């Protein structure tokens, strides 16, 4: 289906960037609230040697990539998330089919435009009037895995600030970002990521799955959707201040304050089992209260995502909770 869409759009000329001969392995997608800015601080705090590693809110898995690059993980790695497209894409890259994905992304890239973005975004829906859309089919019923992965990466690279958001019908509804031509079909980057991802088990699962697998000597890192910093219109997602509650919906069900309490209970169980964990979240009063019996470090980070331009460069405070 994706190639049928491409056949209706003209090629557009653009200047390609030079291909790097050496590519450092890193996340295949950009993720809101990514931890690159805090990584050095995290590495100072995290265990220097880990048996098995768990990252239940996988996202871009930047912490996993960093720990692997430092040789800290001695055993197995388990990455999981409830975002089905993310898991399908990651497993496809891991399986060695990165060349097929890169090739299709390149074909999309050759024709990138605002019109193409929305046509690819809307393959699983139809317009019903008043600019509203209705879901017509499950994405995996109409696209093969390579198309799913290429679409996911393309939308991530071209949508508004790499935000992943779905509406109540489970439809990805983030608008296009800056629509000028880009070259993001990086075969080398996908290949290097595949090499590192091959060291992990990647599955679609709830964070509670770690309770069955983690043992003393293992390390669990939680990076859940963040608790809102304040009530009202301003929300915090992944440490990012957002105006408008609809920006918090990574899944149809969202992640509520009640979910934050259940996550704390999960951390309590891990602690009772002697499993080391760390958790990132906002500096919200609820988070401070839930984790007051643990080590809570407040960190300042510059975040750029906001729906109003005059607040784009505000510094935000978030916390890192540890039981060690």
Specify the residue positions occupied by each region the protein language model found.
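Conserved acidic-Pro-Pro-aromatic motif
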Residues: 217-311, 315-317
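SAM-dependent nucleic-acid methyltransferase catalytic core
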Residues: 2-41, 93-221, 225-248, 262-265, ...
């Amino acid at each position: 289906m994706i190639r049928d869409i491409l056949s209706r759009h003209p090629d557009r000329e653009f200047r390609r960037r030079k291909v790097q001969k050496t590519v450092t392995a890193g996340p295949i997608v950009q993720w809101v609230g990514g931890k690159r800015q805090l990584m050095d601080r995290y590495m100072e705090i995290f265990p220097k040697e880990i048996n098995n590693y768990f990252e239940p809110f996988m996202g871009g898995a930047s912490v996993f990539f960093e720990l692997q690059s430092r040789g800290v993980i001695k055993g197995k790695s388990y990455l999981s998330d409830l975002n089905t497209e993310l898991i399908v894409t990651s497993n496809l890259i891991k399986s060695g089919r990165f060349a097929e994905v890169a090739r299709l992304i390149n074909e999309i890239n050759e024709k990138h435009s605002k019109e193409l973005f929305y046509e690819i975004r809307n393959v699983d829906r139809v317009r019903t009037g008043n600019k509203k859309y209705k879901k017509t089919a499950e994405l995996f019923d109409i696209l093969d895995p390579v198309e799913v992965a290429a679409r996911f990466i393309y939308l991530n690279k071209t949508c508004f600030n790499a935000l992943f958001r779905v509406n109540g019908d489970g439809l990805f509804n983030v608008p296009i970002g800056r629509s000028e031509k880009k070259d993001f079909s990086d075969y080398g980057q996908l290949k290097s990521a595949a090499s590192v991802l091959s060291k992990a088990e990647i599955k679609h699962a709830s964070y509670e799955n770690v309770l069955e697998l983690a043992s003393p000597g293992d390390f669990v890192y939680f990076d859940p959707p963040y608790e809102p910093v304040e009530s009202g219109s301003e929300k915090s997602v992944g440490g990012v201040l957002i105006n408008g509650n609809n920006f918090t919906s990574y899944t149809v069900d969202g992640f509520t304050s009640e979910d934050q309490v259940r996550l704390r209970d999960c951390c309590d169980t891990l602690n009772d089992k002697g499993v080391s964990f760390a958790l990132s979240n906002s500096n919200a009063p609820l988070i401070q209260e839930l984790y007051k019996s643990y080590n809570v470090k407040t960190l300042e980070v510059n975040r750029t995502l906001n729906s109003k331009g005059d607040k784009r460069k505000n510094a935000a405070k978030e916390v890192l909770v540890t039981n060690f």
